Amino acid sequence: MFKFLKQVSDYAKETFQSAKYIGQGLSVTFDHMSRRPVTVQYPYEKLIPSERFRGRIHFEYDKCIACEVCVRVCPINLPVVDWEFNKETKKKKLKHYSIDFGVCIFCGNCVEYCPSNCLSMTEEYELAAYDRHELNYDNVALGRLPYKVTNDPMVTPMRELAYLPKGVIDPHTVPHTSRRAGLRPEEILEQIEAEKTAAEKTAAEITDK
């Protein structure tokens, strides 16, 4: 009889322990169900890169003096600078410039140390290609300006991944329909236009007086 009661007691303890573990797992699941989504629906939604984002390098052919500083400061000696010496002007003349983004680590040293500021970082990060040779950009491809996320009518730009409004810490109390943090690009433009109009109106009133 005592053995039977012990078996029943052990079974009850194991059942309670199992139910406890299942309850803990379900509590985490239900907890995440009540939170707001943090997923960006790419490519229909895209984040607006920060001002210091290190994306594809932009190259201005007319500014380059073929000094090859970018090659010397590059950790992997990546930029290919092809030039010839002009005997009349006694200066280097750039013939061809290329960067292989399949190898580039986007450290930004070439941009930082360029004496003529012919290199700059852009916000372009969509560089995927089926052939690795297509990632080798020449001076023509490097000179192309990227298409900004804020100018793409087919994409909803998102300023940040922080969906919570200012001053709210607990995400569980925020409904999924509430406004995201930060202003949208069109709202920023409207705000700038409103400030500009107000300034012009104030200047006109001062002039009339």
Swiss-Prot record:
Q: Name the InterPro entries on file.
A: 4Fe4S_Fe-S-bd, 4Fe4S_Fe_S_CS, NADH_quinone_OxRdtase_chainI, NDHI
Tell me how the cofactor is bound.
Binds 2 [4Fe-4S] clusters per subunit.
- Would you say which domain of life the source belongs to? Bacteria
| Reactions catalysed, as given in the entry | a plastoquinone + NADH + (n+1) H(+)(in) = a plastoquinol + NAD(+) + n H(+)(out); a plastoquinone + NADPH + (n+1) H(+)(in) = a plastoquinol + NADP(+) + n H(+)(out)
Signal peptide extent: none
Residues where [4Fe-4S] cluster 2 binds: C74, C104, C107, C110
State the EC number(s).
7.1.1.-
- Pfam families named among the record's database cross-references: Fer4_7
- Output the Gene3D superfamilies linked to this UniProt entry: 3.30.70.3270
List cellular component terms (GO).
Answer: plasma membrane-derived thylakoid membrane
**Residue ranges of every copy of the 4Fe-4S ferredoxin-type domain listed in the record:** 55-84, 95-124
Any GO molecular function: NADH dehydrogenase (ubiquinone) activity
What subcellular locations does the record give? Answer: Cellular thylakoid membrane
GO biological process terms, alphabetically, are:
photosynthesis, light reaction
Query: Which residues are noted in the entry as [4Fe-4S] cluster 1-binding?
Result: C64, C67, C70, C114
Keyword list (alphabetical) reads: 4Fe-4S, Iron, Iron-sulfur, Membrane, Metal-binding, NAD, NADP, Plastoquinone, Quinone, Repeat, Thylakoid, Translocase
What is this entry's stated membrane topology? Peripheral membrane protein
Name the coenzymes or cofactors required.
Answer: [4Fe-4S] cluster
Q: Coiled-coil stretches, from where to where? A: none
The subunit field of the Swiss-Prot or TrEMBL record says: NDH-1 is composed of at least 11 different subunits.
User: What does the UniProt record say this protein does?
Assistant: NDH-1 shuttles electrons from an unknown electron donor, via FMN and iron-sulfur (Fe-S) centers, to quinones in the respiratory and/or the photosynthetic chain. The immediate electron acceptor for the enzyme in this species is believed to be plastoquinone. Couples the redox reaction to proton translocation, and thus conserves the redox energy in a proton gradient.
Q: Which NCBIfam families match?
A: ndhI, NuoI, PRK05888.1-3
Q: Which family is it part of?
A: Belongs to the complex I 23 kDa subunit family.
Q: What is this protein called?
A: NAD(P)H-quinone oxidoreductase subunit I
> Which species does the entry assign this protein to?
Trichodesmium erythraeum (strain IMS101)
